[in-house]
Amino acid sequence: MLGCDTVTTLQPAYKLLPFSHDALDVTDSAAVEDCFRQHQPDSVLHLAALTNVDRCQTEPDRATAVNIAGTRNVALACRRHNAELIYVSTLAVFNGDAAEPYSEDDTPNPRSIYAKSKYEGECIVGELVERHFIVRAGWMFGGGIEDKKFVAKILDLARQRDELTVVDDKFGCPTYTVDFANAIRHISESRRFGVYHAVNTGSPVSRFDLARRIVEIAEITSCTIRPVSSDTFPLPAPRPRMEAGVNDALAAAGLPIPRPWDEALFDYITSRLSSS
């Protein structure tokens, strides 16, 4: 999902060596070390992660293996080979109790196994790799036909059903993979190491209002979106009430700020529909 758009965005300017899970298992420390010895990278973008929040909750050992041990393997290899590391994380590292979006200065307090594993990954990167970037995303969408996240699911379901119920008490910042990949490029080129949020701008939006906007852009008039409480859909993993962030570090560094999420959402949906 993010990997495809990152390769497309960065390929013209950089020599990239993308690895699928089949090609490189980050939980295999020997394989990671062999890869570094063979290719001697200057910079590593660490995208490998178990991101299914509920699967992480029900399979904590797997989440630990991939998101924590895997990240440690990559970070140690970066330190041994003097490579800088770009680590992609999530705004879910915050507990979600705040009334306003989170900044990079706020203290993480993750609740779910997934969020805890990603935050531990952040700590590992910060401890082991001197030259590092930690870049947090919001509610990700993008990746074309490979997209299986919320936006793509709503698009598909709304064309199949007369009515959808969507929770209206969880808020976040949609983050377009294309814009996130561009932010990674700007952050890396800045040489200003540290922690960044890179989310599309705009007011935090509920899942319900986001779903309504999705069907509006797609001009799907046959499906009604109805609001419900998240208590209606009990899930294995807890979700933050507020999962939105602000791009204070980008602004402080004088780097480009991602465009409004509504504009990005419109471009993504119209592009997806035109290619389907």
Where is each model-derived feature located?
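Amphipathic terminal alpha-helices
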Residues: P260-S276
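SDR active-site strand-loop-helix element
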Residues: F19, V44-A48, L85-L91, V135-A137
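Mid/C-terminal beta-alpha module of Rossmann-like enzyme folds, strongest
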Residues: D5, A183, S190-P236, R241, ...
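NAD(P)-cofactor binding segment of oxidoreductase domains
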Residues: V44, T58-I86
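Adenosine-cofactor binding site in Rossmann-like domains, unifying the SAM/SAH pocket
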Residues: Q11-D34
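NAD(P)H-binding glycine-rich loop region in Rossmannoid oxidoreductase-like domains
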Residues: S29-V66
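Catalytic helix-loop patch of NAD(P)-dependent Rossmann-fold dehydrogenases
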Residues: A65, A69-N73, R80, V93-V135, ...
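NAD(P)-dependent short-chain dehydrogenase/reductase
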Residues: C123-G172, V178-D179, R185
